[in-house]
């Protein structure tokens, strides 16, 4: 392929533009995944206690892939400008590996959405909230963080239980074993609080008087952020894969035409 051919120069320009976009997308993907793994809503303990925090694993992979995409796009641009077969061959080998990792990240993130069900968080809450008799130290740690997370959620977001306060009444739970139904029909955090974080009217809260306890469940406040992050990692990653596929295909065609 003659390097002074205007058609070749135009094709080189298109490939360079394509790789610039790939590099920028890599930076954006890394930033998105960093935001996700930083756990802005502090919900990681709830996922870890289910022994399935794969969505965070997908985000860590996405972060690694984003950095690699940026570096490889720079390598590809250098190889295209120099029309160097060896540089581009090294680029292809590494890009295929990175591409495979990103496919795994997208699939993992997309499939995790079906995992975030009400029954999952309900079972976990009933089993671990204020459970002071864990069988192992690992369970003790998980119970402690699950309890702290639920206390914060109910106080901060003005909700109670997964579906509502009735969760504490209808189902057997570690909380019910530790507390009497008369004094603690539901956790104190379900009560409407005053400025000092004390129940506005404890008796009214225990009796379930409207306006003195939170009747809304916390499920939407838990699943919403997780779903958004899962779809963000999955579909933005998928869009990057689609763009990268065509850029990679064009680069392979260019590589095949470079003279030895």
Swiss-Prot record:
Heterodimer with uroplakin-3A (UPK3A) or uroplakin-3B (UPK3B). The chain crosses the membrane at residues 16-36, 60-80, 87-107, 230-250. Residues 37-59, 108-229 are extracellular. This is Uroplakin-1b. Gene3D superfamilies: Tetraspanin. InterPro entries: Tetraspanin/Peripherin, Tetraspanin_EC2_sf. GO terms for cellular component: apical plasma membrane; apical plasma membrane urothelial plaque. The gene is Upk1b. It is a multi-pass membrane protein. Pfam families: Tetraspanin. It comes from Rattus norvegicus (Rat).
